[in-house]
């Protein structure tokens, strides 16, 4: 019995350290964005990085109307923008598509000034058949 206790005491810090990664797994992930330009008559798939994962959160049992409640979500901390230019577009067509590329991520309150804070669709979208 004493040996089990010693092993548990030795392993407990290691388990707690490995568990911290499980509690907050907000990190960069590779994604593909399908973009269609009807004006240019083309459809492309762009590979980029985004933020995805779980953030530690808790919900109060009692909800007070005086206290605002929010959940932390996995958001871009730093990002840049890249552009793609559609080829073979008619004159005056909008041939430039600009998209964000995540450089780092963080668990934070969603900032609706720069982010769509709604629920993401799990459905993969493709180009429309014309």
UniProtKB/Swiss-Prot annotation:
Localisation: Secreted
Domain of life: Eukaryota
Keyword field: Disulfide bond, Glycoprotein, Hormone, Secreted, Signal
GO CC aspect terms: cytoplasm; extracellular space
SMART domains: GHB
An MF annotation (GO) of this entry: hormone activity
Key word Secreted present: yes
PROSITE patterns from the UniProt entry: GLYCO_HORMONE_BETA_1, GLYCO_HORMONE_BETA_2
Keyword Disulfide bond: yes
Short name of one Pfam family: Cys_knot
Coiled-coil features, chain-numbered ranges: none
Family annotation (Gene3D superfamilies): Cystine-knot cytokines
Residue pairs linked by disulfide bridges in the UniProt entry: 26-74, 40-89, 51-105, 55-107, 110-117
Chief location: secreted
Residues of the signal peptide: 1-18
Glycan-modified residues: 30
A biological process term (GO) from this entry: G protein-coupled receptor signaling pathway
Protein function: Involved in gametogenesis and steroidogenesis.
Quaternary organization: Heterodimer of an alpha and a beta chain.
Family: Belongs to the glycoprotein hormones subunit beta family.
UniProt-listed PANTHER family: GLYCOPROTEIN HORMONE BETA CHAIN, LUTROPIN SUBUNIT BETA
Protein name listed in UniProt: Gonadotropin subunit beta-1
Native organism: Carassius auratus (Goldfish)
Lineage of the species this protein comes from: Eukaryota, Metazoa, Chordata, Craniata, Vertebrata
């Amino acid at each position: 019995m004493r040996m089990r206790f010693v092993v548990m005491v030795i392993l407990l810090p290691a388990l707690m350290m490995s568990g911290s990664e499980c509690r907050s797994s907000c990190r960069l992930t590779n994604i593909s964005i399908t973009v269609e330009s009807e004006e240019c008559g083309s459809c492309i798939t762009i590979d980029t990085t985004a933020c995805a994962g779980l953030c530690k959160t808790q919900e109060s049992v009692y909800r007070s109307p005086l206290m605002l409640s929010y959940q932390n979500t996995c958001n871009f901390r730093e990002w840049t923008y890249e552009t793609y230019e559609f080829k073979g577009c008619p004159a005056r067509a909008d041939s430039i598509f600009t998209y964000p590329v995540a450089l780092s991520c963080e668990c934070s309150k969603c900032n609706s000034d720069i982010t769509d804070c709604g629920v993401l669709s799990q459905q993969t979208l493709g180009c429309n058949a014309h």
